């Protein structure tokens, strides 16, 4: 009997194929593109501020205002190896995808910004919002889903203060509007218009772009050009 046609060989081949698929899927899912989610049309209301004492997380704000988290916009402040502050805004129940942000700004990596960097841009940690900021002091990336929202709450760039009834298309300032959120199962693919499906995988290896981070720290440098 041909050993290549044995049951064991066929099972091994299936296992190898599944392993390859899983390894490929894991990093692909991290940066999977997704369509902006639609939002129910609403009549715009007048923008105003409201005091939110001690509410420096989107969950605390929504609880204080008795508002659904899907009607809020949250901020994530990042910086990159190129320097500069990057303020990212997504719907309150979504997560910023750092891989998408890295690609959007043409950087090698992004990391969390410091409180000092945030204040230098004219805003306040825990109360950041995309209204009234100077685009010369920061890059503002807004997820495409946010621009379909209406009458939302967001930070007012003042301590213990938030905006309510903000209209993103009317009130927000930004550098770019694009897909920067982490995709989830059921989201629509922007290419085939099908719906994404998530599957559990096993990561057996990964390549990290470390550049000179560790070599410089360990003084592992060349003594001369040769």
Specify the residue positions occupied by each region the protein language model found.
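Extended, low-hydrophobicity, polar/charged segments
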Residues: 1-226
């Amino acid at each position: 009997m041909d050993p290549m046609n044995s049951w064991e060989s066929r099972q091994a081949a299936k296992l190898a194929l599944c392993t390859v698929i899983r390894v490929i899927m894991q990093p692909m899912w991290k940066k999977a593109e997704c369509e902006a989610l639609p939002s129910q049309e609403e009549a715009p209301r007048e923008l105003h501020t409201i005091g939110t004492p001690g509410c420096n997380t989107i969950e605390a704000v929504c609880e204080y205002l008795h508002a659904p988290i899907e009607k809020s916009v949250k901020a994530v402040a990042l910086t990159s190896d190129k320097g500069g502050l990057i303020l990212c805004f997504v719907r309150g129940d979504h997560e910023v995808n750092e891989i998408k942000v890295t690609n959007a700004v043409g950087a090698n990596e992004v990391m969390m910004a410091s409180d000092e960097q945030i204040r230098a841009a004219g805003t306040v940690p825990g109360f950041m919002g995309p209204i009234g900021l100077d685009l010369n002091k920061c890059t503002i990336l807004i997820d495409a889903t946010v621009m379909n929202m209406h009458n939302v709450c967001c930070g007012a760039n003042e301590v213990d203060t938030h905006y309510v009834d903000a209209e993103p298309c009317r009130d927000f300032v930004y550098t770019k509007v694009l897909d920067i959120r982490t995709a989830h199962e059921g989201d629509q693919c922007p290419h085939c218009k099908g719906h994404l499906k998530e599957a559990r995988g096993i990561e057996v290896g990964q390549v990290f772009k470390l550049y000179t981070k560790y070599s410089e720290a360990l003084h592992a440098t060349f003594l001369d050009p040769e």
